[in-house]
Amino acid sequence: MATNIKGPAIFLAQFAGDAAPFNSWDSITKWAASLGYKGVQIPTWDGRLFDLKKAAESKTYCDEVKGVAKKNGVEITELSTHLQGQLVAVNPAYDEAFDAFAPAAVHGKPKERQKWAVEQMMLAAKASKNLGLTATVSFTGALAWPYTYPWPQRPQGLIETAFSELAKRWKPI
């Protein structure tokens, strides 16, 4: 049976940062290869590593990105759109918490945030095609999550604030 699994591979999002070797595509792919990884999954929201819009529009850019990975001893396994995909379907109870995953320009504007997320997903599909990838990884959103799992984590003081508000409303009654 044929398989499309490539690896071992590593998801780069949790390592990307402002310090070398985690702050550029060239250095992070060298780092991943030095650890024995054969593949890398690119977080499409991190502009230090990848320009999603440019990748959707330019096969040349995608060829350059693939070339750097190959030169450094790894291949791209998938593009990751976990954060953007999550924003396609946010339960209104979580609007404020999920704003942290979107650009400031759409904070507090759920419809605009969702539109931005859908656009990001479309760009990722085009970029994946330009990279020659046949799969992508994402989250689908969390319309039912408030009823099943507390994610994203509650901000500090949320429960205390809720009980204080309940007290204000019910004490007069």
Task: Locate each region found by the language model.
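Structural motif
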Residues: 35, 43, 130-131
